Amino acid sequence: MQQIPMTVRGAEQLREELDFLKNVRRPEIIKAIAEAREHGDLKENAEYHAAREQQGFCEGRIQEIEGKLGNAQIIDVSKMPNNGKVIFGATVVLVNTNTDEEVTYRIVGDDEADIKSGLISVNSPIARGLIGKELDDTVNITTPGGVVEFDIIEVNYI
């Protein structure tokens, strides 16, 4: 199976979610199933069927997280020498050459991406256009709104 790039924080978040699902959510669902069984006829017991459905979702998510963590390639850029090159995990400050608007993005794994927080997926068009570029480079990024030109003014490995 293919390795999944992940930051240290992304791996921590998945481990926290896995711990919650296994130690809190799973026991809650088991209890709900047991209570629903006590109500009798399982064929027409909506509570029972809802709890079983929740159990399926929970177990599926547990398997998904365990699979991702098992194939994770955890990258800690803070331990790498900063040579000004944009890599996975780097925080990049860009200036839109048309509007002079400054934006900051951190390139992270798919599960960590949150554009409102400035976290972009390594597979996003912006990240793909930035990876491998260097400090002071000018890059053209194809976005849904068209091609946008950015200057890379800062690259941090934090």
From Swiss-Prot:
Keyword DNA-binding found: yes
The organism's place on the tree of life at top rank: Bacteria
Gene Ontology BP terms: DNA-templated transcription elongation; regulation of DNA-templated transcription elongation
Entry-linked Gene3D superfamilies: Transcription elongation factor, GreA/GreB, C-terminal domain (3.10.50.30), Transcription elongation factor, GreA/GreB, N-terminal domain (1.10.287.180)
PROSITE patterns: GREAB_1, GREAB_2
Keywords assigned by UniProt, alphabetized: DNA-binding, Transcription, Transcription regulation
Molecular-function annotations in GO: DNA binding; RNA polymerase binding
Family from the record: Belongs to the GreA/GreB family.
Name of the molecule in the record: Transcription elongation factor GreA
Source lineage: Bacteria, Pseudomonadati, Pseudomonadota, Gammaproteobacteria, Pasteurellales
